[in-house]
């Protein structure tokens, strides 16, 4: 078995996080996320009895009934739109053509935020898969530490893509009058959280490597800086999603698939 990979996060250089500790924090975040997601499914399914059936007043929402009804609507034949599920996934959900038609500038901003966020999430999932594979004893042609180093460049690239998207969103809210007037404090808090998550990641990495974002801080604070970024990201980029307006990253794709597209 390969040598244990040293994690960047910790209370100090000596007290680094272990794989088990990271899995505990991750599991807590995922459980909170799933509880909120199921609660939303129950809320959306209130009164639902089935696809094409009349709602039943006072009927308690069921997540299973909601998902069954949603899937029946997704797979039902449409007479006004003939788009396939694959076409909707690519054009409406990934490419976000509805936003492009309304505003190309806003589309670029959304694509940077959505693409950066989801790609970084996928890269983290790949890292987790490699670690789990190594933990259960399956031989790989590389170690988890080598794979983490391999992912460093994509992480930098999509981290900056996310940062650019967030900065554009902040500039729009500050200097575009109609956007500023339509924004409430809750909107500012949400975009501020994403900005803090993104910046804290760059700063934690900069302190550790001494590259650009270190701000002259002592390298000894690199582990707690990385720990702050990790816990903050788990809380607000996973656990918090179903309880905030960011649930739209799940709700909108579900609606687009059920309604056979967004054109």
Curated annotation (Swiss-Prot):
It catalyses: methanophenazine + coenzyme B + coenzyme M = dihydromethanophenazine + coenzyme M-coenzyme B heterodisulfide. Disulfide bonds: none annotated. GO terms for biological process: methanogenesis. Pathway: Cofactor metabolism; coenzyme M-coenzyme B heterodisulfide reduction; coenzyme B and coenzyme M from coenzyme M-coenzyme B heterodisulfide: step 1/1. The lineage of its organism: Archaea, Methanobacteriati, Methanobacteriota, Stenosarchaea group, Methanomicrobia. Pfam families: Nitrate_red_gam. GO terms for molecular function: CoB--CoM heterodisulfide reductase activity; metal ion binding. SUPFAM superfamilies: Respiratory nitrate reductase 1 gamma chain. Its cofactor is heme b. GO terms for cellular component: membrane; plasma membrane. Belongs to the HdrE family. The gene is hdrE. Keywords: Cell membrane, Heme, Iron, Membrane, Metal-binding, Methanogenesis, Oxidoreductase, Transmembrane, Transmembrane helix. It is a multi-pass membrane protein. Binds 2 heme b (iron(II)-protoporphyrin IX) groups per subunit. The keyword Disulfide bond does not apply. This is Dihydromethanophenazine:CoB--CoM heterodisulfide reductase subunit E. It is found in: Cell membrane. It comes from Methanosarcina barkeri (strain Fusaro / DSM 804). Its EC number is 1.8.98.1. Part of a complex that catalyzes the reversible reduction of CoM-S-S-CoB to the thiol-coenzymes H-S-CoM (coenzyme M) and H-S-CoB (coenzyme B). HdrE may be responsible for anchoring the complex to the membrane. The chain crosses the membrane at residues 18-38, 108-128, 150-170, 184-204, 221-241. The dihydromethanophenazine:CoB--CoM heterodisulfide reductase is composed of two subunits; HdrD and HdrE.
């Amino acid at each position: 078995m390969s040598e244990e990979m040293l994690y960047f996060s910790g209370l100090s250089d000596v007290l680094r996080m272990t794989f088990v500790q990271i899995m505990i924090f991750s599991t807590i975040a995922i459980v909170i996320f799933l509880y909120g997601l199921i609660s939303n499914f129950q809320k959306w399914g209130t009164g639902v009895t089935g696809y094409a059936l009349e709602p039943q007043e006072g009927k308690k929402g069921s997540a299973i009934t909601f998902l069954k009804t949603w899937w029946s609507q997704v797979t039902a034949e449409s007479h006004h739109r003939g788009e396939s599920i694959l076409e909707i996934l690519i054009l409406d959900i990934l490419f976000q053509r509805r936003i492009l038609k309304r505003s190309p500038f806003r589309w670029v901003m959304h694509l940077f935020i959505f693409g950066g966020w989801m790609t970084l999430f996928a890269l983290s999932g790949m890292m987790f898969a490699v670690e789990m594979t190594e933990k259960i004893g399956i031989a790989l042609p590389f170690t988890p530490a080598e794979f983490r180093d391999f992912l460093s460049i994509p992480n930098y690239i999509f981290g900056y893509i996310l940062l650019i998207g967030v900065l554009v969103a902040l500039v729009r809210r500050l200097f575009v009058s109609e956007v500023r007037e339509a924004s409430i404090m809750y909107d500012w808090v949400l975009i501020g959280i994403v900005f803090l998550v993104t910046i804290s990641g760059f700063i934690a990495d900069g302190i550790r490597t001494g590259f650009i974002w270190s701000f002259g801080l002592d390298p000894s604070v690199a582990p707690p800086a990385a720990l702050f970024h990790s816990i903050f990201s788990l809380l607000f980029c996973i656990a918090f999603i179903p309880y905030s307006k960011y649930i739209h990253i799940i709700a909108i794709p579900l609606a687009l698939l059920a309604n056979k597209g967004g054109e």
